[in-house]
Amino acid sequence: MARAFLLVLDSFGVGGAPDAERYGDLGANTLGHIAEFCAAGAADRAGLRAGPLKLPNMCSLGLLEIARQASGDIPAGMEPPERIFGLHGSASEISKGKDTPSGHWEIAGTPVTFDWGYFPTEGDAFSPELVEAICRQADIPGILGNCHASGTEIIAALGEEHIRSGKPICYTSSDSVFQIAAHETHFGLDRLIALCETVRKLLDPLNIGRVIARPFIGETVATFERTGNRRDFSVPPPEPTLLDRLVEAGRKVHAIGKIGDIYAHQGVTRVIKANGNAALMDATLHAIDEAENGDLVFTNFVDFDMLYGHRRDVAGYAAALEAFDARIPEIHRKMAPGDIALLTADHGCDPTWRGTDHTRERVPIMAFGPGIRSRDVGIRSSYADIGESIAHHLGIEAGSHGRSFI
């Protein structure tokens, strides 16, 4: 039996990107800075966590050596393992963006070598012509926001006005994205999804990567809270990905969390929705039980990025990493001979960095399973090597990008 389990710790970068300066991210290091804050006691939070960052299972998969290779530094305060199991290394990104689709598509063997469209103006981000077209086609009275913003902050600032006026909150960031926040009951979840579908069509000519529905509940600024009904409306990848090649070869792709949305549901045979890292891990373990020979189980663990990276919450990010690490043995116990599990990330989002955006970083590669020997695979020149390694392991034809390290 040969199966593959690909787990993306969304935004868990390890620093060291050779082109970080071009993105204003020279020195950004998600793992390194979290560990530094933890070692200094700056990520202690009563009832949540305290002390140095404790990731014993990932360290046994080579995380400290990965960090040393990628950025030149061993994370502060972390305990080295007695020995390293499995394949370990890191990868640089060749895609031009530092966003979720770019990272995931490159992981699956399709780097984004073209330029995304963006909304670079921080105020009045969307043109009057675009706003007018959205309002007319979606039959809405107008929009709120129209700026670069943090999602939680703009909901706090405009949520009550949104409820009163019926106008959705529209905003963007340095990524190629158009985000729409609306109340699940006052505006309606189905109406929000329909609005996003309308906006998606209008933005296709502008080459905007994603339209994201951001539903929330609550009646006042003190009670507003995002729900788990987020939806991403992505443009499809520009060429077949690992997922497409697997499906064409008669294999199944179990897409957990937002994986289906990221690939515009291309190359996906089964979509499994779950909300929160714990539920995503539960869903992953259940999918492993059901996966057949040749299948791929593919999960995005979004909380690292959405709840802690963008919100610059170091303690929250550290606690989430420790909780994830504690469950890695559950994956080990589910694995059969011939299986491989691979942990990686799609970009960085250093919670100690300025602003609220992603950071350009290398990502870790930690691969393990029965029969997988410990080996340093070095610094890979593209995330695409990850997808090609899975393709090789599952015995399908190689793609056009990347090189297997298996």
From Swiss-Prot:
A biological-process GO annotation: 5-phosphoribose 1-diphosphate biosynthetic process
Native organism: Agrobacterium fabrum (strain C58 / ATCC 33970)
Listed EC numbers: 5.4.2.7
Assigned keywords, A-Z: Cytoplasm, Isomerase, Manganese, Metal-binding
Protein name per Swiss-Prot or TrEMBL: Phosphopentomutase
Family membership: Belongs to the phosphopentomutase family.
Any single GO CC term annotated in Swiss-Prot or TrEMBL for this entry: cytosol
Cofactor needs: Mn(2+)
Matching InterPro entries: Alkaline_phosphatase_core_sf (IPR017850), DeoB (IPR010045), Metalloenzyme (IPR006124), Phosphopentomutase_DeoB_cap_sf (IPR024052)
Spans traversing the lipid bilayer: none
Name of the encoding gene: deoB
